[in-house]
């Protein structure tokens, strides 16, 4: 069966519990039509590049799907109807990535940077006083 990566964006006003319910609803549709969800990742609330339907932020969710094309048609139809879904995108892939997706790796990398101390530079001493410019002597 073909493999798909499906990402949908839910309104920021929706609680994380509502997003989880929406994810389980979509997963139920997929399994009901003979497919299976191999991986589900909730990327959390992220800022959007531009406003979509009066929203500046959204919940991002990734689903790796293994199933026929009729599944994609049905979940996209249901997401078009659902008021909490802002956008969705389904891409056919040759194979699914093992381990975390690129977005999750980026989030882990950002957390590691925060562990390094952020912007605190306590090891540096105080600033040196500015030197006065040399006096110009005119003859």
Curated annotation (Swiss-Prot):
Transmembrane portions of the chain: none
Region Disordered, residue ranges: 97-139
MF GO annotations: small ribosomal subunit rRNA binding; structural constituent of ribosome
Gene3D superfamilies (alphabetical): 3.30.70.60
UniProt xrefs under InterPro entries: Ribosomal_bS6, Ribosomal_bS6_sf, Ribosomal_S6_plastid/chlpt, Transl_elong_EF1B/ribsomal_bS6
Gene Ontology CC annotations of this record: cytosolic small ribosomal subunit
Keywords, in A-Z order: Ribonucleoprotein, Ribosomal protein, RNA-binding, rRNA-binding
A Pfam family assignment: Ribosomal_S6
Record field: compositional bias (Basic and acidic residues): 97-133
Biological process, per Gene Ontology: translation
Family: Belongs to the bacterial ribosomal protein bS6 family.
Its job: Binds together with bS18 to 16S ribosomal RNA.
NCBIfam families attached to this UniProt entry: S6
Protein name, UniProt field: Small ribosomal subunit protein bS6
Species for this entry: Nitrobacter winogradskyi (strain ATCC 25391 / DSM 10237 / CIP 104748 / NCIMB 11846 / Nb-255)
Gene name of the record: rpsF
């Amino acid at each position: 069966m073909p493999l798909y990566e499906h990402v949908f964006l839910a309104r920021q006003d929706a609680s994380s519990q509502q997003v989880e319910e929406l994810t389980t609803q979509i997963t139920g549709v997929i399994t009901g039509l003979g497919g299976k969800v191999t991986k589900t990742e909730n990327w959390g609330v992220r800022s959007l590049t531009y406003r979509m339907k009066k929203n500046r932020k959204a919940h991002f969710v990734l689903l790796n799907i293994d199933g026929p094309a009729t599944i994609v048609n049905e979940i996209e139809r249901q997401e078009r109807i659902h008021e909490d879904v802002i956008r969705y995108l389904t891409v056919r892939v040759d194979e699914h990535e093992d381990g975390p997706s690129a977005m999750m790796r980026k989030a882990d990398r950002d957390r590691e940077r925060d562990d390094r101390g952020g912007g605190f530079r306590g090891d540096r001493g105080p600033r040196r006083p500015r030197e006065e410019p040399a006096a110009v002597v005119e003859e």
